[in-house]
A protein has these predicted regions:
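Membrane-interface helix-loop junctions in multi-pass transport and translocation proteins
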Residues: 70-76, 83-121, 148, 152-173, ...
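Single conserved hydrophobic/aromatic residue that forms the stacking wall/gate
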Residues: 1-8, 12
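Short helix-capping/hinge motifs at transmembrane helix termini and TM-loop junctions
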Residues: 28-33, 37-39, 94-98, 127, ...
Length: 212
């Protein structure tokens, strides 16, 4: 149906953005912790929170889909339930000495994930749409290639400090975009829907002969 197709398209476009953000934050966690917080030991918590990027993205887009279907109360209820679980887990996990602040990060990830899963259950109920492996394969492969490139950069530039982050980002963006285009993970419609840079990327692709 049209609603199911629209939901699938919206979720896919969100994954195009969240997959590389998750991978980038995971591999750059130690650098970010040292630069922003002056606390390299917080890297584990940041890596844990990086998973939340994927789940938060899914939660946000699934909330929008349910609101578009006129089921505005459902995501609110799901968010309240997930928040209650987060409070319990935060209280429990942070009390474990071996976890500490990482326990709070884990509780937040569960919060995002539970709210997203509950939303997706209702989306399936009303539209028949469900997440599939094929729907995340291309962004995941592209993000994995990007992750390998980022890891290589931060390994070689280990003594560069903050510049290592900038170097990694400078390499990550073209690698992710190039692989995503190479595997057919982004079409003209996908590019046009991206805010701010979509039309510019499409114009560049047309000049290079990738898009007609």
């Amino acid at each position: 149906t049209r609603v199911r197709s629209s939901a699938a398209s919206d979720v896919y476009k969100r994954q195009i953005i969240t997959c590389p953000c998750f991978v980038g934050m995971y591999f750059l966690a130690e650098k970010i912790a040292a630069l922003i917080y002056n606390a390299p030991g917080a890297a584990d918590a940041i890596q844990t929170m990086s998973v939340g990027i994927l789940l938060l993205g899914l939660h946000q887009i699934s909330t929008g889909i349910l609101q578009g279907l006129g089921r505005t109360s459902i995501p609110v209820i799901n968010m309240i339930l997930a928040a209650a679980v987060k409070v319990f887990l935060s209280w429990t996990l942070t009390a474990i000495p071996t976890l500490g602040i990482k326990g709070a990060a884990m509780a937040t990830v569960v919060d995002f994930g539970l709210a997203a899963v509950l939303n997706m259950i209702f989306i399936y109920k009303y539209t028949g749409f469900a997440l599939s492996f094929s729907g995340v394969f291309k962004p995941a492969v592209s993000a994995a290639a990007m992750g390998a490139a980022v890891y290589g950069v931060i390994t070689l530039a280990v003594s560069w400090g903050a510049w290592a982050i900038l170097a990694a980002i400078a390499v990550a963006v073209p690698v992710y975009g190039g692989v995503l285009l190479a595997v057919g993970g982004m079409g003209k419609d996908d590019l046009e829907s991206l805010p701010f840079i979509g039309h510019r990327l499409l114009a560049a692709g047309q000049k290079l002969g990738y898009f007609r």
